[in-house]
Amino acid sequence: MTDAPFDRADIDALLGARHPDPFACLGPHRVGDATVVRTLLPGALRVRAIAAGGGVLGELRQVDPAGCFAGALPDGRERGERPRYRLSIDWPDARQDVEDAYAFGTLLDEDALARFAAGDPRAALACLGARALDMDGVPGVRFAVWAPGASRVSVVGDFNGWDARRHPMRLRRPWGVWELFVPRIGAGERYKFALRARDGAALPLKADPCACRTEAPPRTASIVADLDALERFGWHDDAWLRARASLDLAHAPVSIYEVHPESWLRVAAEGNRSATWDELAQRLIPYAAGMGFSHVELTPIAEYPFGGSWGYQSLSPFAPSARFGPPEGFARFVEHAHAAGLGVIVDWVPAHFPDDPHGLGKFDGTALFEHADPREGWHPDWHTHVFNVGRREVGAFLIASALAWAHRYHVDGIRVDAVASMLYRDYSRAAGEWVPNVYGGRENLESIAFLKHFNDTLHGPAAPPGVATFAEESTAWPGVTAPTAEHGLGFDFKWNMGWMHDTLAYLREDPIHRRHHHDRLTFGLVYAFSERFVLPLSHDEVVHGKGSLAAKMPGDAWQRLANLRAYFGFMWAHPGKKLLFMGGEFAQWEEFAHDATPQWDLLDAPAHRGVQRLVRDLNRLHAAEPALHALDDRPAGFAWLVGDDRNNSVFAFVRRDDAGRMLVAVCNFTPVPRTDYRLGLPAPGRWAEVLNTDGAAYGGTDAGNGGAVQADEIPAHGERWSAALRLPPLATLWLRPA
């Protein structure tokens, strides 16, 4: 080979890991009539160019002892032809034959990059991250990362000794995306990105924002995921997905079991580690299905560095947490759930992210994913960065992650966390600590547009059909579940935080004082049909000193459990879908602790087994009785029979479906049995007592009406017929026409 020039300035910039355009000097280049190959291989002893068949084309001369080599390929190639060669590299302890990463042309389609810059989440999903694939018949990994403010980016990992000089990336300048194909590596490789800010300063090594797999914390590297294996995963849930696509979930029975998967099951014999997805599939899935729940909802499982955040401070929104095993394990978990008749909902956090140095904050030396102004970009309550969802690329990145959960893992629902914090610019901020919108108001117009885009995308052709969206929205923002075409946000369901706060406040009162707080239980019906609601008894209500559900109740242990049973009977009969956090289904005494399992040992006690049995029966009756769910979002599905008996703390109402089927719920929230309580009923004849939360099987006194009551033509409560009931203490009855 002939000598080949290698500019000194280029050498110095490459060795200093600050060259802005490595493809301008590395790889094959025409110099006069010759094709010159230049490489940067720190630590290499000798480099030769070899042909595809293995023959040596020639030696690359070492032009700098730090690892720069250059040489010219033999003549005879047409000017427009890409040279075909490999590099044979002698390292101190091995020889490596590999294609030159800088011999490949541009990787990403310009149209896809333009669509990403315009905010298309499908383009973000297609372009960004690490993808094992073949380029020109050569296996390797394509890396791509959005970092428009960086002056230089390289990919580092085990494959190059974490040397930031080895694999600098190409900038696709109009779009701010850096790309590189690294030959002969594949799925399972650990990697990060080494970036320099615009001023040349080196930044902390950054994990890939679009990584689909990560190391288990506290380690922080990204891992090249085997996306082909996920795409080839042997799903057997076609029938489930077809049924989901045609199901009108708003008028179906929905009862959600909320689970913190890191603590639901731990393996004590192995250092109290969290269970894997496969272990959870064997234990959690049959348990939740056996309890009659329709869905399990998982607190955020996208990789998060701090376990104490319960997943709500994620840095890798595309990657199932490695705490539970590889990504394919989560796919198997969902497959098991669908086979058992359970839907899977995942919590998703597009509002904010933590400040860990390997994460998204100041990713390229600028406020890239967050707002630059701390009045917009820093959350004072959580000490986290606020996503700048008004930036098109950030919105595309986030919504792409939601699409990934729907496509790759077949999840059935996505619950959006902290929506209120996104909707209001002054959320948890004092005067002077927030920036008004362009009209001078407090509404966050960018977040509104983002949430509409999210829902339109998840309900459109880009997503699998039938994926439901849920909003944790704690204010009275109008139209959360209204269609975006009608100026709503477009969610399928909204958590009814007002109902939860009011009813729990009522139940905390000593029964003797409840007459003074009667309206707390009736007020929810004033707005119950303004949105499609979920009634949430979530993790947020059993942490930070709030106490467990059972501990919130007044009285001795028996009365506390009786109160809770009566409350559950009221809740399951009330309009709205149901959600219950783990441990609540058997009335555990301790509040939620992320590093401890639920108090499963309480199930050795008959009283707690009784509450568990009640929740199971409530779920099964709720699913079997269309009157309890078919018109959850319509006034025609509900009517008060007794809403004003504050002196006795008695409530009664009727639920109906559109075929005229009925079920009456009667609640006595005092410890005083009510005998001969005359209740107006909407039909004559025999009414079966289909549920009594005071039943002996549930841990109650077994007071009641012997399984049935008779409605005679005696007017009461505005009805033509009525029956004399015995109302057990602290209990709810359900009656159905026999």
UniProtKB/Swiss-Prot annotation:
GO MF annotation: an example: hydrolase activity, hydrolyzing O-glycosyl compounds
UniProt-listed InterPro entries: A-amylase/branching_C, Branching_enzy, GlgB, GlgB_N, GlgB_N_E_set_prok, Glyco_hydro_13_cat_dom, Glyco_hydro_13_N, Glyco_hydro_b
Pfam families (UniProt xref): Alpha-amylase_C (PF02806), CBM_48 (PF02922), GlgB_N (PF22019)
CDD domains linked to this entry: AmyAc_Glg_BE, E_set_GBE_prok_N
Listed GO CC annotations: cytosol
Catalytic activity: Transfers a segment of a (1->4)-alpha-D-glucan chain to a primary hydroxy group in a similar glucan chain
Pathway in which the depicted protein is active: Glycan biosynthesis; glycogen biosynthesis
Keyword line: Carbohydrate metabolism, Glycogen biosynthesis, Glycogen metabolism, Glycosyltransferase, Transferase
One of the GO biological process terms: glycogen biosynthetic process
Tree of life domain: Bacteria
Enzyme Commission numbers on file: 2.4.1.18
Positions of the catalytic residues: D417, E472
Family: Belongs to the glycosyl hydrolase 13 family. GlgB subfamily.
Subunit structure: Monomer.
NCBIfam families: branching_enzym, PRK05402.1, PRK12313.1
PANTHER family: 1,4-ALPHA-GLUCAN-BRANCHING ENZYME (PTHR43651:SF3)
Function of the protein: Catalyzes the formation of the alpha-1,6-glucosidic linkages in glycogen by scission of a 1,4-alpha-linked oligosaccharide from growing alpha-1,4-glucan chains and the subsequent attachment of the oligosaccharide to the alpha-1,6 position.
Protein name: 1,4-alpha-glucan branching enzyme GlgB
Protein's organism: Burkholderia pseudomallei (strain 668)
